[in-house]
């Protein structure tokens, strides 16, 4: 009788559980525990019931097969289809040759432009350096001649300025009033001995207002050295003054101011277009 009553109590408990959750969720092991005897019912606790419920819930979820996971794996997925073949072009060879020719022309043109720009840059740098730093440059020759004139005592007396004072030196007079825009006239020639000769002419003006014309000749001994052959100062109404005495030519070799101002042109050369007499 005692075992029958125990079985009835277990069935009633199972019915109570079935009201809240279907009996199918209970595992076989938990149902067998209910029917083992009197001591089995008393061993059930709230913790074991919760454990059985969670076990039944997860078992049901895993048995459903919600997603076909094998189709979402890169290892089992089928390979992608191959790309379609390119369309056949009859002019493919011609286009290839035209592309190669165009690239070769572009490369050649770019190379020529780069080489041309490099050569022009080197030439400009050389001209600037030779003009400013080489002893044979016009700028250094002009400055050197002016310093020699300022330190010459005969030039002090003729132009009427004291030692230590500066004189104005510039090219021929013309419409521009700024002296810096009147560069000195110079001509370079190659002599019979194969050396370069520089002829230069410029005007000087002292603080007292007196002025004169300076003519000079310079020879380039080497690439880094040059020498004045003569430096002459001519003033209206005065005799020629030699800042640098000529060594290799007679004093009559220096052109006169009158001949320089005449129609013979600068240093005996006619500049500009030929005019009919």
From Swiss-Prot:
It holds the Pfam family TIM21. It comes from the Eukaryota. This is Mitochondrial import inner membrane translocase subunit TIM21. Its main location: mitochondrion. One of its GO terms (biological process) is protein import into mitochondrial matrix. Keywords: Membrane, Mitochondrion, Mitochondrion inner membrane, Protein transport, Transit peptide, Translocation, Transmembrane, Transmembrane helix, Transport. Component of the TIM23 complex, at least composed of TIM23, TIM17, TIM50 and TIM21. Belongs to the TIM21 family. It is found in: Mitochondrion inner membrane. It comes from Debaryomyces hansenii (strain ATCC 36239 / CBS 767 / BCRC 21394 / JCM 1990 / NBRC 0083 / IGC 2968). PANTHER family: MITOCHONDRIAL IMPORT INNER MEMBRANE TRANSLOCASE SUBUNIT TIM21. One of its GO terms (cellular component) is TIM23 mitochondrial import inner membrane translocase complex. Residues 77-86 have a biased composition (Pro residues).
